[in-house]
Amino acid sequence: MKGLLDLFKQFTPDEHFDAIKIGLASPEKIRSWSFGEVKKPETINYRTFKPERDGLFCAKIFGPIKDYECLCGKYKRLKHRGVICEKCGVEVTQTKVRRDRMGHIDLAAPCAHIWFLKSLPSRLGLVLDMTLRDIERVLYFEAYVVVDPGMTELKKFSIMTEDDYDAKKQQHGDEFVALMGAEGIQKLLAEIDLDVEIERLRGDMTGSELKVKKNSRRLKVMEAFKKSGIKPQWMVMNVLPVLPPDLRPLVPLDGGRFATSDLNDLYRRVINRNNRLARLLELKAPEIIVRNEKRMLQEAVDSLLDNGRRGKAMTGANKRALKSLADMIKGKSGRFRQNLLGKRVDYSGRSVIVVGPTLKLHQCGLPKLMALELFKPFIFSRLEAMGIATTIKAAKKEVESGTPVVWDILEEVIKEHPVMLNRAPTLHRLGIQAFEPVLIEGKAIQLHPLVCAAFNADFDGDQMAVHVPLSIEAQMEARTLMLASNNVLFPANGEPSIVPSQDVVLGLYYATRDRINAKGEGLIFSDVVEVQRALDNGQVEITAKIAVRLTEWTKDKESGEFVPESKLVDTTVGRALLSEILPKGLPFANINKALKKKEISRLINTSFRKCGLKETVVLADKLLQSGFRLATRAGISISIDDMLVPKQKHDLIERAEKEVKEIEQQYVSGLVTAGERYNKVVDIWGKTGDEVGKVMMAQLSKQKVEDRHGKLVDQESFNSIYMMADSGARGSAAQIRQLAGMRGLMAKPDGSIIETPITANFREGLNVLQYFISTHGARKGLADTALKTANSGYLTRRLVDVTQDLVVTEDDCGTDAGIAMRALVEGGEVIESLRDRILGRVTAIEVLHPETQQVVVPAGLMLDEDTLDIVEAAAVDEVKVRTPLTCHTRFGLCAKCYGRDLGRGGLVNAGEAVGVIAAQSIGEPGTQLTMRTFHIGGAASRAAVASSVEAKSDGHIGFNATMRYVTNGKGELVVISRSGEIIISDQHGRERERHKVPYGATLNIKADQQVKAGTVLANWDPLTRPIITEFAGKAKFENVEEGVTVAKQVDEVTGLSTLVVIDPKRRGAAKVVRPQVKLLDAAGNEVKIPGTDHSVTIGFPIGSLVQIRDGQDLAPGEVLARIPVEGQKTRDITGGLPRVAELFEARTPKDKGTLAEMTGTVSFGKETKGKVRLQITDPDGKVYEELVPKEKNILVHEGQVVNKGESIVDGPADPQDILRLLGIEELARYIVDEVQDVYRLQGVKINDKHIEVIVRQMLRRVQIVNPGDTHYILGEQVERASMLDTNDKMRAEGKMIATHADVLLGITKASLSTDSFISAASFQETTRVLTEAAIMGKRDELRGLKENVIVGRLIPAGTGLAFHRARKAKEEMDDAERRSIALQEAEEQALLTPATTAEAVVGEEPAPPPAQ
């Protein structure tokens, strides 16, 4: 009976494992797995379809092909379970053992495993200290390797050709041993003594950098072998395991052909060659034949393991490369990504979606037929429970016949059972939401209009998938966490996601506009009901201005009850009627204005913060209903007459054409270069297009009407097109400009701008040429979109992979580190206020009042909307907040450092997978980012033309710390710093605006003066960059030779001549000298820089126009030379997605700038051929020098004092330099600002903390600078958390700890270098990751989400984190219990046998224990 029960006991996998280890298998291990040796290459008998004995599908080895039946049919049925048939040798058992029983092949000659040979760096090469080329020559029988030199002069490990070998053999006879093939390699590997090698390498860590690097690499591999207990000779195999046959099936097709897995072909080839080799060895065949066969065997084994890794790939009959074992697991269609990370799911369906305007937010319409299929098991169980069907079979029949009772049961089953809807591509967590199904007729799923924004769905044929959560736990999670009405905020930025759009916005906007002199204007009503009556009877129009008495409910501070308060309000009919839908506690002022899309969003946000989730969802639903109704009633439509072409358009275009003609004239007479002409023309047309757009909008947006008193007044226009754009329902000013203004400039496919614009608009119609020019851009747009989607998806994948294991694991790590946040100000505009930046963060230290120094906000408090009101009132301009970057939690993050969970509005919960959320928030808008990189012109050139800054507000002038200026001969202040900024602060000392001022600008203000708004603070020439002297003196030219280093240019029109510095590449002679100017004082001595003995030397860069004469007297601030900006290389501004990817991959930019390595004084040493030697001397006299190419623009001059990390050579910054010189905080600031710049340009809002989370993951590894007493190796990169753990251990033992330097890894690198080999292997470079892991005998602790998904456990995030914690706690308790029981037993044993213990102590013969 017990056997029978065991039989029905379900096959349960081993639940309890905490880690997975990977290693190399020894030959004994492989044999122990095996159920028999595969000796023949035959597969199955094509007539009987039975497997051949000893072949690749042998039933004796792998198990029976029919359940509980042996091959010859002697034993059938369950009663013979476990019997081995004496006739055919097959065990009688289930056929599914053919999925896990392995076989083996005994190789007649050893074969090297190709992964350890060819996967770079070659592990075999590292262990043997031989080059890959040499090992290959030995393995493939082209050369001998010396295994035992004996008493000869030969060296072990040395390589010899066949001729050498013959010569040496004749000379020395059998004194030495040299071998070919894998045997030789295996022998060498077996003779390596790991301990001795490790000692030797550890002692040999000095000398050249290359040697240290090589030794540390070898040491790492040796230590790995030693630690994991793996013997190096196992990298060469004597036994080959054979995959279970059901994993490489052979399926008979009709017509006598077979479909087979490629592995069978590869195995057959190995077996054939192996058998042939064995026979040749038996026959003692000539060496050369045997050798060839061994080589072929090695090649066959190579292709089986990884086809195409070395040499040509083996091909099948149809010339396509065979799919080897390695190909099975790697790539998108490999085991990891196809089957383990992305599975097909049962209980799911998909259909087209249609709009369901009558649904509530938490509902979706589910077609009846689909529901019937999806909920089948629930219906069956219900039918059985009600006694309508006795068996499942009967229930099935009942359902198929479709009796009315089935539909009733379906209604019952579906009640309160949420289903999940998903729309591909699922770019963020709102791409899957749960809804309560409502049964509908038809075959399309109905979707609530408000969730379309989150799904990015529209109803032009989109499809969605439905999934049914089965277990009670799954239903509960779907209900509490995923229900659409619980997800009303975007996790990326905390804005509401259920904002109405399009028709709804238009309806609400129209109804809340006011029209002058509408019917019923000036009436006063007693309540809203009366207004509704008047509207219904046609006595008032919906846009009429009226007064009405409204009741507002305000919350009482003490009791928390709502108290009514009624007052007379000036409003319009539409707004008064809308007031009905406001929840209690939301003031009428929120809708007493024209509701545009932004306003509606703000309304929903305010409602969420003030009235809570439930009220907000109800409000959103009501807004939706009203909006649709009002839009229908408004009857807004557009006609061609709504597109008003501005009257001034003709004049503006004529003026522009005149300007362009002038420039053409200048170009012909040689005043401007071709490039300047193009830029200016493009600029003129760009400006004209904007102006036409401006006058058009001005004309569209206003209309003249008579008011009640018969006067003509302006009012905002009721033009349909204008209303659509103004409300945010559809279209934008730019699009209206194309309809009624002018289309403007078009781009060529390569992104450069065509200088002849399209002056027509769509209202007037385009001519053939204009239409043709338009097609360029339109087609490129479509092609770009396709590329963009793929690139964006790949970026998201990399981001998710690098952050997937970051989960909130504790409440507070107790640090007070953080970053100081202030408002983001650029060019005098506040781009992002302090409030927006710190909302939802936790304060790191107390926030003090700037004047009274009292505590405004204590440390460790989350800044919500109310707290921020207090902060703003106190005029605080800098707050230090906690950040994921400085969180001290080892594995994971703490809630305080993360702050508010943006998708829910409260402090983040433990178990929230913040890493994945960050990755999704950054990746999701990726498709909106432009791929097109702006070339200078059009968009970018207009920014460059700024030539002055003016104050935007009244205030007090201050300069930043790096601002430096001199007074020139005319008494003007000239800026000589590169990063100077003017700061304007208000009377509280709060910074209001900040303006960057370029080198060479003239200041019109002094420090500490008061200015009025509109004052011009500074101006400069935007088209040239000056070079200015700080000191007075007489100019003395050096190396300025006409025709050699400079050329004289004479202007044909004006006749003036200027000197231009020639590019050294074009010079005939004097290629290495640099034209420069020194200054002499009155006595004729060189002027020195104060405080140094360096003379003032100012170089003229390439292409600069020299503005002074030799011997001229100069005052400080005088311009020595100008560099035309157009002459500078116009660097492409990498924009959009590629820029984001570049930042997260931490790539060093090309033409990168140089930062000062230390604080000190600049000097120039001896120059080399094309480079300048730039030196920095610190106060202690230490010198750092760097060679800078001459064509680079050096931003410093001799004798200037620079600070560590300051820019000294022009160019984009390298993130690695920023980290090294300025630290983590500066690096984070740089990456966050740069990424935000790209997204801001597209109008995408992302919270800073998401980017910080990614930066934390990029910094998660450190490089060991000094290993101390730890087991680390110098220069090794290790996980930060594990290093800190090791150091804690060392401290506890009183040993020396390891010191480290921070390392910044790009996201791809960081994903591949995680401690989890399962996660890394499923990401990219599977072979390399697994090879490395196998040699190191790595354990995967299954910490991240991905590894757990792959091994099929609950993920350690969300509810899964609690489950894992509970499981661990229970295991620990069980362990403790087991130990205590064992102790108890031991004590009892001891009490039973007192004599034995005592005697044993004395040391006599112990007495035999008493008989029990």
From Swiss-Prot:
Residues 1388-1412 are annotated as: Disordered. Its cofactor is Mg(2+); Zn(2+). Residues 1393-1405 have a biased composition (Low complexity). Its EC number is 2.7.7.6. Keywords: DNA-directed RNA polymerase, Magnesium, Metal-binding, Nucleotidyltransferase, Transcription, Transferase, Zinc. Binds 1 Mg(2+) ion per subunit. Binds 2 Zn(2+) ions per subunit. GO terms for cellular component: DNA-directed RNA polymerase complex. One of its GO terms (molecular function) is magnesium ion binding. It holds the Pfam family RNA_pol_Rpb1_2. Zn(2+) 2 binds at C813, C887, C894, C897. CDD domains: RNAP_beta'_C, RNAP_beta'_N. GO terms for biological process: DNA-templated transcription. DNA-dependent RNA polymerase catalyzes the transcription of DNA into RNA using the four ribonucleoside triphosphates as substrates. The RNAP catalytic core consists of 2 alpha, 1 beta, 1 beta' and 1 omega subunit. When a sigma factor is associated with the core the holoenzyme is formed, which can initiate transcription. This is DNA-directed RNA polymerase subunit beta'. The gene is rpoC.
